[in-house]
Amino acid sequence: MTTTQRTAVVTGASSGIGAATARRLAEQGWAVVAAARRLDRLGALSAEHPGIRPCALDVTDPRSVEALADAAPSCDLLVANAGGAFDLATLADADVDTWARTYDVTVLGTVRTVQALLPALQASRGQVVLTGSTAGRWVYEGGGGYVAAKHAIAALRDTLRLELVESGVRVSEVAPGMVATPEFSAVRFGGDQDKADAVYAGVDALTAEDVADAIVWVATRPAHVNVDLVQLTPQQQAGVHKVVRRPPTP
């Protein structure tokens, strides 16, 4: 008796949570289409595991998203992970173009990707897992653009859950708190690595692998189980303004 190999598409797969998720899925026997803008990094990722196939993707470009759908005519799982935060400006000082970029990548990019892959997901009675954030439920000063985008992701998850329930497609969200990834905070601070490192100072933060483990767990529940939301945080983070920072152990 043979078992058909399942296919997963992971966006934002060139680094961080996306790359870790692609690895975890491939380790469990999935055929993984790892999609992102940086093909050099995807090539290195696919070299690690024969089950990972790179695919160039810019989620802000409809033609690029259509090409992704052509590259994955069969799809059992979409991990819509592409997104970003590009500023920490207050609402009074915010640059509208920066907010538009955040929304285009994080929200509209997710919409484009889901739309393109939905026929394949419906055919397989598959699953959509959105990478959310505690920023989709918590708010903080200077985070308005990113917070609004991640609140929108939470709303998309709720909407898709209602709209796809009759099709058999499952819809889930994995929403991490503080995750120490090499690039996320550095991009947000305009490349100032010292400021980026200070975000996680004294905190045993989540890793990309921690979040990937949660995504893979959600994606491997029995078909009759829909995990609506998994929110995970470091033990030291009980809220956006409740983070216990401890000095490093000698």
Predicted stretch roles:
Residues V114, A149:
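Active-site helix of classical SDR
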Residues E173-V174, Q193-H241, R245:
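C-terminal helical subdomain
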